Amino acid sequence: MNQTVDGVAPNKSGPVIEIDHVTKRFADYVAVADADFSIASGEFFSMLGPSGCGKTTTLRMIAGFETPTSGAIRLEGTDVSRVPPHKRNVNTVFQHYALFPHMSVWDNVAYGPRSMKKDKSEVKRRVDELLEVVRLTDFAKRKPGQLSGGQQQRVALARALVNYPSALLLDEPLGALDLKLRHAMQFELKRIQREVGITFIYVTHDQEEALTMSDRIAVMNAGNVEQIGTPTDIYDRPATVFVANFIGQANLWSGRQTGRLNRDYVEIDVLGSKLKARPGDTAIEAGGHATLMVRPERLRVSMEPPVGDVAAVRATVRDMTFQGPVVRLSLVAPDDSPIVAHVGTEQQLPLLRPGDEVYVCWSPDASLVLPAADIPTTEDLEEMLDES
C-alpha cells in the first residue's frame, strides 16, 4: 500500500513517522519545543492537549503545511522536513470535510485515484473497497447534502484513504458533530483504522476521544510533550501533575515524601497523616516536596474505621451530588485539603449530610506520588477546556 516520497523508496522496517528533536518558533513564540518521538506502522496515535499546546502545529509539520525551525521529520525513513505537502504520502482530514457538493459519494471518493491517472478498473476496485469499509455502499449515488454528518465524515475518510497513504492525519474531525454522534463515530473511526491498517495520527483536546480510540497518546502542554503512553498508562501512571489533572479527574494533594518503605512503596506526609503510596517514575528525595494523586473512583467512604492495608484519613462531608451512575462526594480533610470521591450508586452508601465525619480510604496501589507542582483549581481547568 505504501508509495514513494519524492521519488525515494520508503524504508518499511522502521517507524512510519519520526519526530526528531523538532522545535517550531513563530518569531519569539515557541509553539513546539524539542519534540522527540516516533509513531509505528498501523498505530492509532493521538496528540492531546489544551489550546496552544502545540498539537496542531506538530500535525501541520507532519503534513508539510509548516516547516520545523530545527530538527527533522522523517516519513518511512526519508527526511521530509522541507518536502512540500503534495509530495508526502500522507492525507489530512479536517473538521470541515470539504466534500464536492455537486459530486456523488462514489465520485467524491474516486477523485484521488482519478487525479493520479489510475485506470478505471483500479479506481472502481479502490472506491468499492473503501465504501464497503466505511459502510456506505448503499449511499454511493447520493450527494453529500443528502447525508447525515456522520455519513459525510465517513465519505471524507474514504476519500482520504483511497490513495493508500502511509499515514492519515486527523485534525479534530469530530468537532462539528453533536455529542451522541461524536461518541458513535469514535468507535467507527477505530474500527475503520483497524480494518485498513493505516497509521492514524489524531489531534484532539477531548480526553474521552483520545482514551477511547488510541493505541498511544502524546499529552502536550505549552509546546512540550509531557508524556507518551497507552491510555491505561496515561490514566493510571501519569508522569506529571498536569497529565493527572488533564486526563480524567484526580485528587491532588501537596505534601512531603518522608522516605521509602520498601522497593514498592514510599511514605508521604499529606492530609495531616503519614500514608503509604506508590512511587512515580520520577525519583523524589526523602523530605522533598511531592504531590499525591488518587482518582475519585478509587476512594471508599465509610462511617467505621477501615481495616487492612489501606491508606485512610478522617474527612468532613461538604456536599453530595447525584450524577447518575455515581454519587459525587465533596469532602474536606483535617488540613483543609479538598477531597472528591465518586461512589457507585450500587454501593450501600450511608445516609450522609453536610458536616458528617467519615473515613475516606483507598488502597496504596491506587495512589501515585508525583513531583511537586502547582495544582490547578477547578476554575483553571474549566478555562483551559473552554479555550480548547
UniProtKB/Swiss-Prot annotation:
Protein name: Spermidine/putrescine import ATP-binding protein PotA
Enzyme Commission code: 7.6.2.11
PANTHER family cross-referenced by the UniProt entry: SPERMIDINE/PUTRESCINE IMPORT ATP-BINDING PROTEIN POTA, SPERMIDINE_PUTRESCINE IMPORT ATP-BINDING PROTEIN POTA
Gene3D superfamilies named among the record's database cross-references: 2.40.50.100, P-loop containing nucleotide triphosphate hydrolases
Pfam families in the record: ABC_tran, TOBE_2
Main localization, broad class: membrane
Binding residues for ATP: 49-56
Keyword list, A-Z: ATP-binding, Cell membrane, Membrane, Nucleotide-binding, Translocase, Transport
InterPro entries the UniProt entry points to: AAA+_ATPase, ABC_SmlMolc_Importer, ABC_transporter-like_ATP-bd, ABC_transporter-like_CS, Mo/tungstate-bd_C_term_dom, P-loop_NTPase, PotA-like, PotA_ATP-bd
Cellular compartments per GO CC: ATP-binding cassette (ABC) transporter complex
Function according to Swiss-Prot or TrEMBL: Part of the ABC transporter complex PotABCD involved in spermidine/putrescine import. Responsible for energy coupling to the transport system.
Localization: Cell membrane
Gene that specifies this protein: potA
Catalysis performed (reactions): ATP + H2O + polyamine-[polyamine-binding protein]Side 1 = ADP + phosphate + polyamineSide 2 + [polyamine-binding protein]Side 1
Keyword DNA damage: no
Keyword presence, Protease: no
GO molecular function: ABC-type putrescine transporter activity; ATP binding; ATP hydrolysis activity
Topology of the protein relative to the lipid bilayer: Peripheral membrane protein
Quaternary structure annotation from Swiss-Prot or TrEMBL: The complex is composed of two ATP-binding proteins (PotA), two transmembrane proteins (PotB and PotC) and a solute-binding protein (PotD).
